[in-house]
Amino acid sequence: MVSRWRQDRGQPTPPPLFALETHGRADALFDGDMDTSETVGLLSAIYPLRVDTGDPRQVRELLTAIPGDGIDYGLLRYMRGDTASRLAEFSGPQLLLNYLGRAEVGGTSGLWLDRGLLTGVSPLPEPELAVRYELSLLATVLGSGDHQVLVTQWRALPDILSESDIAALQILWTQALEEIVT
């Protein structure tokens, strides 16, 4: 999607570097003595992933090969002095992908989604906070049973990505999803 967008704009198309955000509760990595079920607050892990293929199967293989659900990167980048300084030399990703998982909504009569839930959520990043990514794409699967949909929220910096840029990226996103399911 990103490479195609860059290509359409006549820009160089190096393999894109994404920041992937996961839930950060990698309980399976710890022995049975550790219980994080009563931990308060949101835990997340963010790690970079360079995607040099357009084949969804190869992307899946890349993701499953990442050890420790990605939490290792944060430990190496921020907690160890010897690796933190080396990793800090590299440019970070411009695009964040955050899959929030599945949420049951509606019932057996079909999908029901209260679109009013998102009316107060701005597509712009929080104005009082520092912004790490030019574009953040949050995705979740909503529904139950056979009535499930993928819902996304796109948050971008308008000084960097225009509405037409976002619209073009959303079209390419939709086309990529259609290729995957057909």
Predicted regions and their residues:
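Active-site catalytic microenvironments for nucleophilic, acid-base chemistry
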Residues: M1-D8, R50, A176-E179
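His-Asp-centered acyl/peptidyl-transfer active-site segments
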Residues: Q7-L124, P158
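Short strand-loop-helix active-site module centered on a catalytic nucleophile
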Residues: M1-V2, G70, I166
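Extended, hydrophobic beta-loop-alpha segments that form or line the acyl/peptidyl-thioester binding
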Residues: P14-E21, G74, P127-T182
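Short amphipathic alpha-helical segments
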Residues: V2-S3, R60-L63, Q170-T174
